[in-house]
Amino acid sequence: MNTPLIVICGATATGKSGLALTLAQRLDSIIISADSRQVYREFDIGTAKPTHAEQDLVPHYLIDICSPTQTFTVADYQDKVTKLLQSTPCLSPSLLVGGTGLYIKSIVRGLKIPRVAPQPQLRQELEALGQAQCYAMLNQVDSLGAHKIHPHDQVRTLRALEVFYVTGVPISQQQGEYPPTYPILQIGLDSTPDALEKRIEQRTQMMLTMGLVKEVETLMEKYGSDLPLLNTLGYAEIKEYLQGKMSLDQAKAAIILHTRQFAKRQRTWFRSYREIQWFDPTSVNFLDNVWMTIQQFLA
């Protein structure tokens, strides 16, 4: 499979989806979401999921494929995208679009990911020991893997221990990179902090206007307030509002603040990859410059 792949990445609220929609129509391409929350059904407004009208314009994939109670891993994502790319007719490039850096990295770098299903009972037992002891245990069985994980990063520590206890092999020995052979163009969107902050404020207000509060309320009634996805950006703040812990104005301000912090972390992640070509979506010739780059890539 040598069909070119065009990646559109960057921080949240930089206009990735809008650009992808325009380019996909010009190129007669499909759009593959690289967003870890858009895979879940019913989480629509708070994840800025493409509307049904937008999905009617261009075929979208890896959206609405899981129940909110299901676990969907990076390995699952990699498997599905790889199969999709292999089955796509070699007529035009596919567009991989989103801000979940690890999803994108799993495709463009060809990460080798341990196929170990989550072990709830094991995790519960490890969590009871505390992060300090878990990290010490990891350092004993896989010092190389522990060196790559921050001592306070409970999620990655537990995952590394989980992989070791299930397979008997340290996670560091099960990882690696096998880059794909097809050509890849990576386009990154990055605007000034002031412009991004304004877009974040506008998008937060738009989500509230579209019915984010009702969406969260419905999800809480159906799945309960302990659903892990309800602790993610945009949903956690509205949940606290619905629980009477803050006013709606406070929830809105919290979403804006947390989105800004999240965007900063995303920017740091993506800026570490030299192969990404960066564009400012607020510049006058933004679309023309992106299109010229794509034409040169496809020539």
Swiss-Prot record:
Q: Which InterPro entries match?
A: Dimethylallyltransferase, IPT, P-loop_NTPase
The reaction(s) annotated as catalysed by this protein in its Swiss-Prot or TrEMBL entry are: adenosine(37) in tRNA + dimethylallyl diphosphate = N(6)-dimethylallyladenosine(37) in tRNA + diphosphate
Q: Enumerate the Gene Ontology biological process terms.
A: tRNA modification
Keyword tags? ATP-binding, Magnesium, Nucleotide-binding, Transferase, tRNA processing
> What highest taxon heads this organism's lineage?
Bacteria
Q: What are the required cofactors?
A: Mg(2+)
Kindly list the positions annotated as binding substrate.
T12, A13, T14, G15, K16, S17
Task: List S-S links within the chain.
Answer: none
Binding positions for ATP per the UniProt entry? G10, A11, T12, A13, T14, G15, K16, S17
Gene Ontology molecular function:
ATP binding; tRNA dimethylallyltransferase activity
Q: What is its EC number?
A: 2.5.1.75
Q: What class of enzyme is it?
A: transferase
| Residue(s) at site: Interaction with substrate tRNA | T100
Report the family membership. Belongs to the IPP transferase family.
Function summary: Catalyzes the transfer of a dimethylallyl group onto the adenine at position 37 in tRNAs that read codons beginning with uridine, leading to the formation of N6-(dimethylallyl)adenosine (i(6)A).
Name assigned to this protein: tRNA dimethylallyltransferase
Q: From what organism does this protein derive?
A: Rippkaea orientalis (strain PCC 8801 / RF-1)
